[in-house]
Amino acid sequence: MADPARAGRLAQRIKVLVAEALRRGVKDDRVEPVTVTEVRVTNDLQHATVYYTVLGDEATVAAAHEGIQDNRGILRREVGRGLTIRLVPTLEFVADTVPEAAAHLEDVLRAAKERDAELAKAREGASYAGDADPYRTAEPDADDAPRA
C-alpha cells in the first residue's frame, strides 16, 4: 500500500507525462485533439486509469480512441522514462464523459429556469380564488368564548 499523497503525486506526474507524450512523442495525427483530464492510480501503484476528452465529432472521437489504443505501448514507455519508480503502472485509457454530462446538466438547468420564468409571469396577474382567509368569520365561535 502506498501513501495516498504519493499516489496523488504519481497520478499528477503521469498526467503530465502522457499529455507531453501525446503532443510530442506520438507521431499519429489521430491523437492530436486529445486532452488528458485526469489520472487515477490504484493504491498499489500498479495500474493507472487515464481519462481523456476529444474535441470534435463522433468520427474524430472514434479515430482518437483507436489512435490511443494503437500507441498505448509508446505512451507507457514514455511514462516509464519520466518516472523514477521500479515498476511502471499499466495504463488504461477511458473517454471522459464529464463534459457531456455537464453540458446536459446545463441544458436541464436552463430549461428549469425558463419554466420558472413562465410560472412567475403567470403568477403576476393571479389573485386568490376567494377571500384572504375563507375560514375566518366576523362572529366568534362558541368554542372561542372565554370560559367562566
From Swiss-Prot:
Q: Which Gene3D superfamilies match?
A: 3.30.300.20
Where do the TM regions start and end?
Answer: none
Any coiled-coil regions, as ranges: none
What is one GO biological process annotated to this record? maturation of SSU-rRNA
- GO cellular component terms listed in the entry, alphabetical order: cytosol
User: PANTHER family annotated for this entry?
Assistant: RIBOSOME-BINDING FACTOR A, CHLOROPLASTIC-RELATED
Family affiliation: Belongs to the RbfA family.
This chain belongs to the protein called: Ribosome-binding factor A
**Species whose genome carries this gene:** Micrococcus luteus (strain ATCC 4698 / DSM 20030 / JCM 1464 / CCM 169 / CCUG 5858 / IAM 1056 / NBRC 3333 / NCIMB 9278 / NCTC 2665 / VKM Ac-2230) (Micrococcus lysodeikticus)
